[in-house]
């Protein structure tokens, strides 16, 4: 079969999964559960030959182990198909959410950002924190695409002494976006599994995102003191003024307000609201700005380049969802609380430590955080471990975010390693201390502000 035909089949299958999922959410027609699950099984079989290495073995392990567990539990056909469809929300998000990033890349905004960066971020701390904050803001809308965009801004003028520190800032900024972006797989997975609206966890996650900035600066403050920056540019020497692009600021703020307003007014799942907003809001913005050519190019690039590049993640996430469903059929959700009761600490505290250690520990050895998060969110009843659903959501999202910068399998670490011409471990290692401090900060934050 010709590669072009195969690629078209894969795209059609992925779009079909999203379409059936949306139809199921709108109609609640139960037969669609079987169609959706069947499409997922077909997609995994079709995409499996494209996988290599750890991703291939993990996907196969999840499918085989999940099938064995369901067979041992004598689960009926409905459970099999429901389990297969657990993570289709993420596939749907992959299809639509990246469209929000098209207006962010408008040439006028990128040029204005370059000047803003060059003129305003002159001190070492300002450059470090500004890079992290900008990556976080851009990451909310363009996901991993924020890394090359901000990288080009940061490294327009080489800063040899700060290369690795700025890479840390990029890495941790992306982790901050994981904490609160409604367009990320992490938020979709956790809020969907726990039945929470995004707005209910947003205040806590924004607080945690601010905490991550402080912890990041604290961890690297000693190194920042001993670095000499390059000479400022002529624009900076002349003290020219450069403000953050007004249009881009309005676009970013309005995108969040649109989602918050839709969540309150329209009684639909968050994923469907994001799909609706992603199809209309960026298109309308580019139309008003007279940048429809940029929109068409961005849309075409998303369908023909970005989506095919996500085949590995899509297959792994679907397999992880199936495995999570099989775990949910067992008594795993009851076993964990009963084991934790033997430890002489409050169950909520013990479970929090266990969760952070599990997600961070498995990420450290190369397992994607979605795997433990899917299992925990899908099989543990927060009330059984004496915590609230919101506490559980903050715990899972916080653990995922602090694990991302230390994972050798994360897309960000691999992308930065390529850009900096270093090994992925050289990029990840400086973040170990950050992850440890954030883990401690997360525990304190949960116990003081979120509570049980």
Per-region residue spans from a language model:
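Membrane-core helix-loop-helix motifs of multi-pass transport proteins
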Residues: 2, 158-249, 413-445
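Long, contiguous bundles of hydrophobic transmembrane helices that form the permeation core
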Residues: 4, 210-298
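Hydrophobic mid-bilayer segments of alpha-helices in multi-pass membrane transport proteins
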Residues: 12-17, 31-71, 90-97, 248-254, ...
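Core transmembrane alpha-helical segments of multi-pass membrane transporters/permeases
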Residues: 75-107, 128, 132-133, 300-334
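Membrane-interfacial loop-to-helix junctions in multi-pass transporters
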Residues: 89, 117-129, 161-165, 309-313, ...
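Membrane-embedded helical hairpins/re-entrant loop segments and their flanking transmembrane helices
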Residues: 106-137, 149-163
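Membrane-interfacial helix-loop connectors
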Residues: 150-161, 188-198, 345-404, 418-420
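Transmembrane helical segments that form the transport core of multi-pass membrane transport proteins
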Residues: 255-372
């Amino acid at each position: 079969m010709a590669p072009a035909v195969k690629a078209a089949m894969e795209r059609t299958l992925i779009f079909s999964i999203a379409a059936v999922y949306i139809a199921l959410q709108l109609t609640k027609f139960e037969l669609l559960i079987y169609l959706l699950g069947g499409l997922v099984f077909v997609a995994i079989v079709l995409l499996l030959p494209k996988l290599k290495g750890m991703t291939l073995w993990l996907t196969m392990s999840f499918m085989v182990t999940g099938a064995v567990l369901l067979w041992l539990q004598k689960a009926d056909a409905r459970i099999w198909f429901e389990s297969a469809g657990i993570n289709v929300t993420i596939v749907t998000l992959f299809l639509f959410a990246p469209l929000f990033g098209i207006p962010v890349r408008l040439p006028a905004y990128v040029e204005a950002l370059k000047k803003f960066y060059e003129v305003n971020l002159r001190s070492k701390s300002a450059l470090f924190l500004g890079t992290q904050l900008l990556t976080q803001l851009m990451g909310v809308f363009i996901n991993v695409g924020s890394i090359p965009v901000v990288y080009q801004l940061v490294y327009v003028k080489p800063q040899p002494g700060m290369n690795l520190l700025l890479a840390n800032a990029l890495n941790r900024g992306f982790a901050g976006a994981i904490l609160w972006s409604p367009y990320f797989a992490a938020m979709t997975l956790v809020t969907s599994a726990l039945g929470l609206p995004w707005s209910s966890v947003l205040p806590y996650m924004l607080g945690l995102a601010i905490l991550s900035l402080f912890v990041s600066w604290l961890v690297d403050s000693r190194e920042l003191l001993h670095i000499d920056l390059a000479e400022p540019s002529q624009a900076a020497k002349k003290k020219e003024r450069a403000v953050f692009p007004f249009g881009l600021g309005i676009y970013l703020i309005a995108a969040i307000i649109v989602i918050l307003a839709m969540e309150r007014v329209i009684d639909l799942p968050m994923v469907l609201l994001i799909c609706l907003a992603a199809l209309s809001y960026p298109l309308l913005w580019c139309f008003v700005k007279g940048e429809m050519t940029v929109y068409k190019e961005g849309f075409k690039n998303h369908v023909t380049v970005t989506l095919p590049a996500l085949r590995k993640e899509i297959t792994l996430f679907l397999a992880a969802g199936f495995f999570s469903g099989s775990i949910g059929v067992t008594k795993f959700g009851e076993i964990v609380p009963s084991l934790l009761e033997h430890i002489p600490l409050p169950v909520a505290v013990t479970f929090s430590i266990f969760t952070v250690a599990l997600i961070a520990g498995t990420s450290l050895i190369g397992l994607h955080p979605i795997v433990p998060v899917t299992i925990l969110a899908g099989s543990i009843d927060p009330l059984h471990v004496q915590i609230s659903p919101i506490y559980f959501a903050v715990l899972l999202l916080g653990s995922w975010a602090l694990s991302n910068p230390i994972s050798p399998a994360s897309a960000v670490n691999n992308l930065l390693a390529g850009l900096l011409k270093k090994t992925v471990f050289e990029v990840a290692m400086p973040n170990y201390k950050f992850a440890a401090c954030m883990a401690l900060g997360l525990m304190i934050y949960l116990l003081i502000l979120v509570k049980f």
